[in-house]
From Swiss-Prot:
Protein family: Belongs to the universal ribosomal protein uL6 family.
Record keywords, A-Z: Ribonucleoprotein, Ribosomal protein, RNA-binding, rRNA-binding
Disulfide bridge map: none
Tagged with keyword Metal-binding: no
UniProt organism field: Clostridium botulinum (strain 657 / Type Ba4)
UniProt-recorded name of the protein: Large ribosomal subunit protein uL6
InterPro entries: Ribosomal_uL6-like (IPR000702), Ribosomal_uL6-like_a/b-dom_sf (IPR036789), Ribosomal_uL6_a/b-dom (IPR020040), Ribosomal_uL6_bac-type (IPR019906), Ribosomal_uL6_CS (IPR002358)
Gene giving rise to this polypeptide: rplF
Length: 180
């Protein structure tokens, strides 16, 4: 048995989980609704305030799907109940972020500002011009949007300039030591 897959997913109050016969899982909660199609090789059942994920056989691919399916359902339940937040920090002279409506405008030292439209299901929040929070109920989407923002200026190892995640540690390098 998968260590992750054998654990049931607890359903908190205010959250409803429904599973169709073709393994489409719908999770509704106070923050919204998520729908995801899961593999037909896995059995998903809702039993008294928990979701139980089981498998029919022990083939390698089915064992891998077992833990994955349970983790995806857990992420959906957490998302509609609490939501997800990824915080990015802009480090560098003149690196700024601001909101224009639902659009995020980044000044990153290019000759032009970088504009990013908010994808449906994701919203931006800017704190002090150098912190950007990406919020949403879909963990995968929040992480993808945060990675898209970070990719514009990845942190460089010499001065640490760039866009980094809040708790990310940048491995620093020593510069050249000049002739003596």
């Amino acid at each position: 048995m998968s260590r992750v897959g054998k654990l049931p997913v607890a359903i908190p109050n205010g959250v409803t989980v429904t599973v169709t016969p073709d393994n489409v899982v719908t999770v509704k909660g106070p923050k919204g609704e998520l729908v995801k199609a899961m593999s037909n090789k896995i059995n998903i059942a809702v039993e008294d305030n928990s979701v139980v994920v089981t498998r029919d056989n022990d083939h390698k691919d089915v064992r891998a799907l077992h833990g994955l399916t349970r983790a995806l359902i857990n992420n959906m339940v957490t998302g509609v109940n609490e939501g997800y937040i990824k915080t990015l920090e802009l480090i560098g002279v003149g690196y700024r972020a601001q909101l224009q409506g639902k659009k995020l405008v980044l000044s990153l030292g290019f000759s032009h500002p970088v504009e990013m439209e908010a994808v449906s299901g994701v919203e931006f929040e800017v704190e002090g011009g150098t912190k950007v929070k990406v919020k949403g109920i879909d963990k995968e989407l929040v992480g993808a949007v945060a990675a898209d923002i970070r990719k514009w200026r990845k942190p460089e190892p010499y001065k640490g300039k760039g866009i980094k995640y809040e708790n990310e540690v940048i491995r620093r390098k020593e510069g050249k030591t000049g002739k003596k």
